[in-house]
């Protein structure tokens, strides 16, 4: 009976060896796969020396004219003009500011003669930032604010009307030009405002150019 026991033991050993070899093959295969995957995770020498181009998004920042030495009212009008028109020329902006200063000193609720009253209480002469005088232009301010819900006595409401008023819009293309002198821009300013007395509006305009910086 001894020989059969020896044969069974040998067969068991062979089976064990086969199992071990199978497990080793599987382990080696997994190791090779892992190494291959790891190698693929790193760039090649060619990729390192000549990396692919990467498109960097461009962030556009538009420069605007600021006037730190101006009053809050002047700064507001300057900002709104640049926000709602294409006026880029400092001289053009300064000309508009100079004319407003001559007309009202940027006091929105001023009636011609100096009285500070609401829109409905100015009975004679011009009113507001640019001294709207004719019945059509004066009523235009009130009608605009009634339609677009703004205060016709306020700086905000009057600035909106000033920019949107048809007579300003007709002259706007000239103000939106470039590299012209203040004297040049005074012509469309006259067509816009139709002043009777020129006063210091051109001098004021030159003063603004000295205070305005592009940032």
Question: What spans do the regions from the language model cover?
Answer:
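Active-site or metal-binding loop neighborhoods of secreted/extracellular toxin and effector enzymes
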Residues: 177-215
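Sec-dependent N-terminal signal peptides
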Residues: 27-35
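Peptidoglycan-targeting cell-wall enzymes and recognition modules
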Residues: 52-81, 101-181
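Alpha-helical scaffolds flanking conserved acidic
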Residues: 90-97, 183-187
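Bacterial N-terminal signal peptides that target proteins for export
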Residues: 20-28
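Low-acidity, Ser/Thr- and Arg-rich intrinsically disordered low-complexity segments
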Residues: 5-15, 22
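Short, charged helix-capping/linker segments at alpha-helix termini
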Residues: 83-91
């Amino acid at each position: 009976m001894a020989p059969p026991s020896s044969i069974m033991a040998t067969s068991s050993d062979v089976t064990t060896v086969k199992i071990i070899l199978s497990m080793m093959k599987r382990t080696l295969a997994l190791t090779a796969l892992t190494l291959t995957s790891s190698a693929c995770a790193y760039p090649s020498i060619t990729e390192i020396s000549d990396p692919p181009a990467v498109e960097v998004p461009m962030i556009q920042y538009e420069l605007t004219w600021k006037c730190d030495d101006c009053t809050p009212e002047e700064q507001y009008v300057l900002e709104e003009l640049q926000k709602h028109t294409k006026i880029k020329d400092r001289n053009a902006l300064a000309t508009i500011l100079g004319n407003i200063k001559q007309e009202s000193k940027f006091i929105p609720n001023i009636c011609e003669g100096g009285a500070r009253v609401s829109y409905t209480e100015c009975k004679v002469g011009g009113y507001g930032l640019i001294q709207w005088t004719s019945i059509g232009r004066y009523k235009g301010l009130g009608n605009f604010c009634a339609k677009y819900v703004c205060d016709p006595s306020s700086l905000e409401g009057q600035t909106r009307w000033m920019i949107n008023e048809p007579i300003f819009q007709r002259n706007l293309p000239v103000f939106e030009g470039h590299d012209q002198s203040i004297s040049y821009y005074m012509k469309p300013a006259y067509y816009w405002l139709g002043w009777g007395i020129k006063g210091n509006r051109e001098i004021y305009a030159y003063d603004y150019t000295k205070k305005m910086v592009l940032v």
